[in-house]
Amino acid sequence: MTLDGIDKALLIWGPMPDEALSYIRSVGWLVIVPEGRPFMTGLKQNAQKLKKAGIKFVYVNDNTLGILFNKGKIFRTIIFYKEKNDTGIIGFCGTMYVTILSRLHNVKIELFAAQALQLAGSVDLLGGKKYILKDNVRDFIVEASDEAVSFKELQ
């Protein structure tokens, strides 16, 4: 699919619970499924669920989100968070990135509790092949971690 083929889209971020499928279906827009590195939650969890449910989606790499926002393709963002507290949420790696892009482009953010991250086997493998750098260079990689996002930042 090309950018011209995307009219109005819903971005989902974080591991989507099954209960969210009916809501996403009711919105009726194309769903943008980012890869969700480093755990590939978009490809390994969300895309599979959407496909099984018959919901139309496109899979994109995380870096493409800036272009989609800039071109006015994303009209709503759903963030599936790990934890909610008095000051905000704890989201998966990249939650702040998606929050900033959504706010910058005046896109409404909705919050839903996430499904537990399902890591079947090594997260270094995709289709049985390594996609993360060799172990001997891990000292040069900034490890992903959960991100705290305040309610102020989410508005």
Identify the meaning behind each predicted range.
Residues 41-155:
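Conserved phosphate- and dinucleotide-binding cores of soluble alpha/beta proteins
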